């Protein structure tokens, strides 16, 4: 009998210790695609069930636009912008697209989002979609310069000098507060045309002299993906396409580090299914979208978007066809499979003229 009481007491003690320990279990978000081994702590302790449910509701509320960002507050909002947000909401619900449309709100994502506290704006950077000009707008709004024309080009991309903090630099509470209450936007363009722009800018022209693209990344891609190893030409678009469409490219991505942001999907950059953005602009309609974004953010009386050269934002099917000429249908289909989420979330037509 005495032994039974001891056994019963021991069981209660184990259960009690397990309950206490569970309160200190940490939950983490990992960087998407393993771009960084570092983990970001989102919740510091586990919570009782009722409190946990409230916490989950709070976290979902953090991601929802409020106030001026709700469509109900803008009965005169042009339908095209509401349709873009609705398209994203519907695509995010598609189970078949889940692996291509969802990502974690990790440090990698938070590093892409620039903050203007003075005017409560968050801008997610999507390289090769005219981001330099939007950075200039935010730099002026933050007060580092009085006009866009005064900003030296080298300062725009020097994030220690341009006065643009990243969302990742704030505390967990600060991040959640800004995600919940600030005006949030980013810009997209046709995914394949964006890849062409990235290839030209980083591997052909390289105007900002970033030697690592030609001297480190290009040789790595050529060694892995060039069919004719005796060919001595520099990297070709075909090599780039094979690399991007390879499901097993992850080890190369890890080697290349954050330099890959110029061709990472919009989903991985900005987490549009997890963060409820206020406006999604399109590069192809930037002449109308830029003034609209400034107006919705309440800053159109303070700054103007730089002049857009005529025709520069138009989709160029001929250019796309020329770049993909001679590339196998298999490689193009694999590339599309990777970027299908970007095509569908943002309403870009499937490029059947390349795939069939």
Swiss-Prot record:
Catalytic activity: 3-O-{beta-D-GlcA-(1->[3)-alpha-D-Xyl-(1->3)-beta-D-GlcA-(1->](n)-4)-beta-D-Xyl-(1->4)-Rib-ol-P-Rib-ol-P-3-beta-D-GalNAc-(1->3)-beta-D-GlcNAc-(1->4)-O-6-P-alpha-D-Man}-L-Thr-[protein] + 3'-phosphoadenylyl sulfate = 3-O-{O-3-S-beta-D-GlcA-(1->[3)-alpha-D-Xyl-(1->3)-beta-D-GlcA-(1->](n)-4)-beta-D-Xyl-(1->4)-Rib-ol-P-Rib-ol-P-3-beta-D-GalNAc-(1->3)-beta-D-GlcNAc-(1->4)-O-6-P-alpha-D-Man}-L-Thr-[protein] + adenosine 3',5'-bisphosphate + H(+); 17beta-estradiol 3-O-(beta-D-glucuronate) + 3'-phosphoadenylyl sulfate = 17beta-estradiol 3-O-(3-sulfo-beta-D-glucuronate) + adenosine 3',5'-bisphosphate + H(+); 17beta-estradiol 3-O-(beta-D-glucuronate) 17-sulfate + 3'-phosphoadenylyl sulfate = 17beta-estradiol 3-O-(3-sulfo-beta-D-glucuronate) 17-sulfate + adenosine 3',5'-bisphosphate + H(+); 17beta-estradiol 17-O-(beta-D-glucuronate) + 3'-phosphoadenylyl sulfate = 17beta-estradiol 17-O-(3-sulfo-beta-D-glucuronate) + adenosine 3',5'-bisphosphate + H(+)
Protein name: Carbohydrate sulfotransferase 10
Species in which this protein is naturally found: Rattus norvegicus
Family, as annotated: Belongs to the sulfotransferase 2 family.
Topology Lumenal: residue spans: 28-356
Disulphide-bonded residues: none
Role according to the record: Catalyzes the transfer of sulfate from 3'-phosphoadenylyl sulfate (PAPS) to position 3 of terminal glucuronic acid of both protein- and lipid-linked oligosaccharides. Participates in biosynthesis of HNK-1 carbohydrate structure 3-O-sulfo-beta-D-GlcA-(1->3)-beta-D-Gal-(1->4)-D-GlcNAc-R, a sulfated glucuronyl-lactosaminyl residue carried by many neural recognition molecules, which is involved in cell interactions during ontogenetic development and in synaptic plasticity in the adult. May be indirectly involved in synapse plasticity of the hippocampus, via its role in HNK-1 biosynthesis.
Endpoints of the signal sequence: none
Superkingdom, natural source: Eukaryota
Topological type in the membrane: Single-pass type II membrane protein
Broad class of the protein's primary localization: Golgi
Pathway: Steroid metabolism; Protein modification; carbohydrate sulfation
EC number: 2.8.2.-
Topology, Cytoplasmic side: 1-6
Gene Ontology biological process terms in this record: androgen metabolic process; carbohydrate biosynthetic process; estrogen metabolic process; learning; long-term memory; proteoglycan biosynthetic process
Gene: Chst10
Translocase among keywords: no
Tissue expression from the record: In myogenic progenitors, it is ubiquitously expressed.
Ranges annotated as spanning the membrane: 7-27
Keywords noted in UniProt: Carbohydrate metabolism, Glycoprotein, Golgi apparatus, Lipid metabolism, Membrane, Signal-anchor, Steroid metabolism, Transferase, Transmembrane, Transmembrane helix
Record-level GO cellular component terms: Golgi membrane
């Amino acid at each position: 009998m005495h032994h039974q009481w001891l056994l019963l007491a021991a069981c209660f003690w184990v259960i009690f210790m397990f309950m206490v320990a569970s309160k200190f279990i940490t939950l983490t978000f990992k960087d998407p695609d393993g771009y960084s081994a570092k983990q970001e702590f989102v919740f510091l302790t586990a919570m009782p069930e009722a409190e946990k449910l409230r916490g989950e509701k709070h976290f979902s509320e953090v991601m929802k636009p409020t106030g001026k960002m709700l469509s109900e507050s803008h009965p005169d909002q042009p339908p095209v912008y509401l349709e873009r947000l609705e398209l994203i909401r519907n695509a995010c619900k598609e189970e078949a697209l889940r692996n291509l449309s969802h990502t974690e709100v990790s440090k990698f994502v938070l590093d892409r989002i620039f903050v203007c506290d003075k005017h409560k704006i968050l801008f997610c950077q999507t390289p090769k979609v005219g981001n330099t000009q939007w950075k200039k707008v935010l730099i002026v709004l933050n007060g580092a310069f009085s006009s866009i024309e005064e900003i030296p080009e080298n300062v725009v991309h020097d994030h220690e000098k341009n006065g643009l903090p990243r969302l990742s630099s704030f505390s967990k509470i600060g991040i959640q507060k800004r995600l919940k209450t600030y005006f949030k936007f980013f810009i997209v363009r046709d995914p394949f045309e964006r890849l062409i722009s990235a290839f030209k800018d980083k591997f052909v022209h390289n105007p900002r002299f970033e030697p690592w693209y030609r001297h480190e990344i290009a040789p790595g891609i050529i060694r892995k993906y060039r069919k004719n190893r005796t060919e001595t030409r520099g990297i070709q678009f075909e090599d780039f396409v094979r690399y991007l469409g390879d499901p097993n490219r992850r080890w190369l991505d890890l080697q290349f580090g954050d330099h890959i942001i110029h061709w990472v999907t919009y989903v991985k950059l900005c987490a549009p299914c997890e963060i409820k953005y206020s406006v999604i602009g399109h590069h192809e309609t930037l002449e109308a979208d830029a003034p609209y974004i400034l107006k919705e953010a309440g800053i159109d009386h303070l700054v103007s978007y730089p002049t857009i050269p005529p025709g520069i934002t138009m989709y160029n099917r001929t250019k796309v066809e020329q770049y993909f000429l001679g590339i196998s249908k298999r490689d193009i289909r694999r590339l599309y499979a990777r970027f299908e989420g970007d095509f569908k979330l943002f309403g870009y037509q499937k490029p059947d003229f390349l795939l069939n």
